[in-house]
Amino acid sequence: MKKILIILTNTRYYGNSKDKTGLWLAEAAEFVYKVQEHGYQVDYASVNGGEVPLDPRSLKSTYRSKEIDEIYYSNDFQNRALKHSLKVSDLDPQDYFAIYYTGGHGVLWDFPNQPALSSITNSIFKQGGFIMSICHGLAGLVTIKDDQGNYLINNKKITGFTNFEEILSG
């Protein structure tokens, strides 16, 4: 059975500051909860592989639920997503029927202009797979070009995180 590839950030800080960022927990955990509920298998990957930091703000009770916590506290998520994510460049796109770009501000630094992400996303798309993102995860899709040099999102309807949502999230 082919799997869904979940792309996570390795970025721990906003640019060169000491302000912490990372993966927005709910944007991975809610998705994982739903797809696993329907019998799909997932792999977790990041540009560098290895550790994936969590945005501390995403751990507030306001952004948590029973389902999010079920995934977050699971050994599988702790080990395969947060401690030992796979390195994107080591993966075979033939193993996946979909790719999902998670959010959190960290992705703004390590998702755009990444050859390994572009390559695996294009391959999954060319084999008829699904390309998905949530929130800031869209940053990973806006720079990807197809084999003809056209942006992959050209002539597609897309959504992303609004400035108003930035204000609401603090």
Identify the role of each PLM range.
Residues 1-127, 140-170:
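Extended, subdomain-level signal for the structured scaffold at the beginning of enzyme domains
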Residues 134-136:
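Short, thiol/selenol-centered motifs that function as redox-active sites or metal-ligating centers
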Residues 131:
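Conserved, well-structured core segments that form or line functional sites
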